[in-house]
Amino acid sequence: MPYTLDEHDQVCVLTIKRRFLGSIERDALQQTVDALIADGRTRLVIDLTKTDFMDSTCVGLLVQGAERLRAADGDARLAGMQTRVKNLFVMARLLGRMFDDYPTVEAALQSFAAPVASRQA
């Protein structure tokens, strides 16, 4: 798998390690999110510091995962996006509407301690 999963103070951190192609990694990512929800672990930081490429299918998978986490009273936040990856989320108008973006994993983890304003689609 091109990612690892760790837990920090009841928040899971999904670190994507390289190029992430949703068409290839779709099933594994969906199974991971499903397992987290089944275990009641619904707060997720997606660490993109090592991700230099992501296709639009992967962006769609992350949106679906975030929606499923929110339906289970959780949330997903993005951390450490490189410019190339961030541009995908900006062009799709997902930052601030679907995802909150943090410069570091630590900042994203700390954000779970503070309330977040509700998003409007």
Model-derived segments and spans:
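A charged, well-structured terminal subsegment
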Residues: 100-121
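Short, conserved active-site loop motifs that form the nucleotide-linked donor/cofactor pocket
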Residues: 11, 99-100
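STAS-typified acidic loop motif
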Residues: 2-31
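Short, solvent-exposed coil/turn elements at secondary-structure transition points
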Residues: 11, 19, 82, 105-107
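General small-molecule cofactor/ligand-binding pocket signal
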Residues: 6, 79, 102
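A short, hydrophobic secondary-structure junction motif
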Residues: 12-14, 32-44, 108, 112-115
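Conserved catalytic submotifs in the C-terminal HATPase_c
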Residues: 8, 49, 106
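Amphipathic alpha-helical interaction surfaces in cytosolic regulatory modules
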Residues: 20-99
